Amino acid sequence: MLHDALGTRFSAAVVRVEQGGRLRYERAFGRTRSAEPSVPCFPDTRFDIASITKVFVSAIALDDVAGGRLALDATLTDLVPEWRGTPHEDITLRRILAHLAGFKSGADYRTLLDKNVEAFALTEPLAAPPGAHVLYSDLGFIALGTILARATPGRSAAGRIESRLAAMGATSTAYRPRGIERPTIPATETDAWRGAVQGEVHDEKAYLMGGVAGHAGLFGTARDVAELGNWYLAALHRRPTPLDPALAREAVVEAGHDDVLRRGLGWALKTSDENSCGALMSPSTFGHTGFTGTSIWVDPARDLSVVLLTNAVHFGRSDIRPIRAGVADAVVRAMDGT
């Protein structure tokens, strides 16, 4: 399946499968871009993981809750005084993590070229009252990045997030790759605004923020993305985890839903339309996707995580949901021996 998609849907891919916290399968495919110069993709190649950034940042937020720096259900006006006396003052960390805060889904980057994106995210009128319904939002997680930075002042947002993730075991996950690293990172899209994008964040809002944001911007390996899933699997299966076990378990049960979406705290949960996790993973499955062509799906019933990293926007913005689902189903069949 992945061989068939190389050269038409993406130029590079890595699949990693872990079960019980142990590596069961890992393979890299393709090259970093379709045109020369390019280099081969390896298992430890770093990809722009796009919105999987949200789940890494959510893990840091939960760690802040465990450490007493934040609270899930308290209002946030002490850290975000811009929200006092506005509908935003009813926003809580739980509502941000579950996409229940009422933020608009996003904004066309062309409307933000002359704006401070962080200030825009904090002050743009809400699309719904906090707590009313699920509305998946980049703006909410841009605000979350600001909240985390203000909760522990004195360090840059990037430095704080990167150091925390490294301490938790995601040692290759970081913002803004160095220039020497960029040719080794799979290229994303070529567009009229920025030209060929390689080694810089694809997401336009994160790019306008200097490459560092709570909703996108991290680059990471398949191993680190699988490690993220393992922090939560370990809590569910009573193994050591860098997260507070009770909070990790709470994060992967439903905190909000609508007719299509089910959300945990940072995570998407399997729905009746199967998301992109296929038909065979258990109903308790949780995961997340990234617009660049990345995904992780975690099946607690099988103690299984499936990571697929690609640069699917390299040839355009076509939907790779069938490929993601096909990979997940193939892994489950192999693990189940069917």
What are these regions (language model features)?
Residues 314-337:
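Generic C-terminus detector
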Residues 296-297, 303-312:
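Short, well-ordered beta-strand elements
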Residues 1-47, 71, 119, 203, ...:
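Short, conserved catalytic-motif segment at the N-terminal edge
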Residues 6-14, 36-95, 126-139, 213-216:
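Short active-site loop at a secondary-structure junction
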Residues 23, 33, 86-284:
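Short, surface-exposed loop or secondary-structure junction motifs
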Residues 2-4, 46, 130, 253, ...:
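Short, P/G- and charge-enriched loop/turn segments at secondary-structure junctions
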Residues 15, 21, 54-57, 61, ...:
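Residue-level preference for non-acidic, small/hydrophobic
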Residues 11-13, 292-295:
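Short loop/turn microsegments at loop-to-beta-strand junctions
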